[in-house]
């Protein structure tokens, strides 16, 4: 981990603490575009990322959900024949089903959602469903790290950090 990157020592310490935690962790990373947020997460958690999803710029809710399900189907074939979820609550229920099939262990598993603010368009229901996924499922396990990343700093601070 540390040997792959130069700099970002404080950030690497925070990510290491999450790996060593005895509970699930939610990490929000935000900042201007093109400063290496995604690189930091992908490089540091290279082997631990189990599910990764990047929001679509100006994407409609239906396209965001379709993209989410396509990414989920890249890591499991369990949902290939299923119809596309109607909303984010249903989409996150598929992610729960996927993780319920992975035995809980001391080894951390990372869920990475990049460009998080792009997914939460007006009336999309994404943030509500994400909060439900985190509170209702992730916090009941001790082996998950959920990393959300975004360039819209004001959104990330207002909706995630605070």
Which sequence ranges carry the predicted segments?
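Phosphate-binding site recognition
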Residues: 1-162
């Amino acid at each position: 981990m540390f040997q792959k990157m130069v700099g970002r020592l404080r950030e690497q310490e925070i990510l290491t603490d999450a790996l060593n935690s005895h509970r699930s962790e939610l990490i929000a990373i935000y900042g201007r575009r093109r400063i290496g947020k995604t690189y930091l997460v992908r490089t540091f958690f290279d082997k631990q990322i189990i599910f990764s999803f990047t929001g679509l710029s100006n994407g409609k809710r239906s396209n965001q959900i379709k993209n989410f399900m396509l990414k989920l189907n890249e890591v499991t074939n369990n949902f290939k024949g299923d119809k596309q979820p109607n909303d984010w609550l249903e989409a996150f229920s598929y992610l729960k089903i996927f993780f319920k099939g992975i035995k809980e262990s001391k080894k951390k598993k990372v869920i990475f959602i990049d460009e998080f603010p792009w997914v939460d368009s007006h009336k999309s229901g994404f943030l509500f469903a994400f909060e439900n996924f985190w509170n209702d499922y992730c916090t009941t396990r001790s082996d998950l790290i959920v990393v959300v990343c975004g360039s819209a700093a004001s959104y990330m601070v207002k909706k995630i950090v605070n």
